[in-house]
Amino acid sequence: MNASRTPASATATSSTTSRPRRIAVIGAGIAGLACARTLLQAGHEVHVYERLTQAGGRMRSVSGPYGSFDIGAQFFTVRDPRFQKVLDTTPGNLRAWSLNNIQTRNAHGRRIDKLAPVRETHWVGIPDMQSLPLAWATPLWEAGKLHLGQSVRAMSHHIANGKGQSHHQWSLMLDTEDHGPQIADGFDCVVLAVPAPVAVQLLQTAPQGAALAKSLATVEMAPCWAMTLSYPMAAQAGLSTLGPQWNASRSTHERISWVARESSKPGRAQTERWTIHANPLWSNEHRHDDATRVLSKLQKAFGEITGIRVAPRHASVYLWQNAQTLAPLGQSFAYDRSAGLALCGDWCTGARVEDA
């Protein structure tokens, strides 16, 4: 693996058996990896397929000439003891970010929230957010169970008979980076741990997926433009940072919803760096814009919020096609036992890392 580093459940109609199952998990983000780990611990054979060349999903981090950026999830909190138990398996990959609370500021950088936010620990991965999913993915990779650079474009299903019983058999049609089109087959169940719109597209490739696809009609997800800015000139004598004294803030600016000083996170390079997320509405309106145009507009908005108007030494933008959950499914997962299909992801109940 590249360690350096993009319906209500249907009524069951088939009986269960105690035999270990062969299960395909599509998507190697937090939800897919957590699902795969749990299934492996239960004794099943699991294979995870990820279209990108690295695991992580929306906890992806990217490297720039002056340090790394968490372009997806910025941090996470722990409110469920079950999630805490999972995190306890990789304690060396986490540190607390010194944000006791996160304030909200207007388009001019002035604080506008009236009440003090709830104070809770904001956790980040070390040396970046992607380190957590990479730690979970490494055992799968070493066991030959994680298949990177393999995009699932369709699924097919048939009923197999054996030992007096019938059971599901699923096949996945893959586009691989190294070997072209391939087929992976012999799966008893398929778990789709991908954004809801992607799940719908895959479910529609097999008639058995129609019920689950229909159940996702009310789920809404929005894109997000992410911008990264580097200011190595702030490392000069007598100058340690640029702009405001705060390190992260939500924003009501018409273009921007989140601003964070990346270099304030523990375990990061100290070169002044900022990560910015555009708000969902603006991102959706400009999802087809040229990246250069988006970069110019977001840089202008960033200057209005922070007062930093000097040109960065390095700047980039990235588009997340399905980044933010606007309307969740309303249940923690969906499972059609009669078809051998399941769905999971943060979009099932919310938009937080813990929801995955």
Q: What are the language-model segments listed below?
A:
Residues 296-339:
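Flavin (FAD/FMN) cofactor-binding core of flavoprotein oxidoreductases
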Residues 228-236, 240-286, 293, 297-306:
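Active-site substrate-recognition segment that forms the wall
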Residues 21-49:
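N-terminal Rossmann-like FAD-binding beta1-loop-alpha1 element of flavoenzymes
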Residues 61-103:
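N-terminal FAD cofactor-binding segment of flavoenzymes
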Residues 75-81, 111-137, 288-294:
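Short beta-strand to alpha-helix junction loop
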Residues 40-64:
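Glycine-rich FAD pyrophosphate-binding loop
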Residues 148-170:
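A conserved short coil-to-beta-strand element within the FAD-binding core of flavoproteins
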